[in-house]
Amino acid sequence: MGGVRSEYELSLRVQGRFFHPRDYGNEMELVQGVMIPGYATYCNVRDAIIYRDARNVAPEPDDRRLLALAIDSKGLPREELYRRSGMDPDSFKQSLARLYQSLNLVRTARGNYRTLPVNRIYEPEDARFYVVKRLILSFGIVSAEGLGMLLKGEIPMAELRKILLRLEKEEILVKGFLKKDSETLYWIVKDDMEHIKGHLFQGSFVLNQGDRLAHYLSEDVKKKFGLGACNVIFSS
């Protein structure tokens, strides 16, 4: 998925001892920002640049003052950034929010605000393809509508369908009516087809509503239990 949201999300995916994502900050140069989907997420700098490329929002002229101040990779605390900016509180708050939401500013593991390297890794369309492809590979099976919901509507449905078609042509995905008693068309990772035949889930865990898997399964949970955001116990 190109990042991790929280310590709890990490705990479900790592066997043995682990630390909070921020504790890996210096070793892996992790940053936190509003990635895609639009959650506060820890990831490495390269992935953050790709997310920024995909979002493709240029900073407004009035925001460039903050960018110039936060250019060091160590970043600046919010209070120090405000003090140096010379801006009034409301303008500073709005400018900081715009830059953070667009990934022109991110936060270091210590919580300081910093910029990312200015050079692109991908052009916007290619960056969005990369982001969507990795998201699909993470979950394994998606419908077009479910993918749109998973991305919180950030990428237009027409573009998502174009990406799904491209992944079909590249023989990464295959499609079909894969869910019992459902007329919804699904795409699944081609290489997974042989591995999942005859397999049933075994084990138990609590799926926290802050986990992206909970967002992925939210419609199924709503249909089965009539509930919105909630923690779900899986056991077999």
Regions found by a protein language model. Name each.
Residues 1-91, 97-107, 227:
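Phosphate-backbone binding and catalysis cores of DNA-processing enzymes
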Residues 90, 106-108, 144, 175-176:
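A local structural micro-motif
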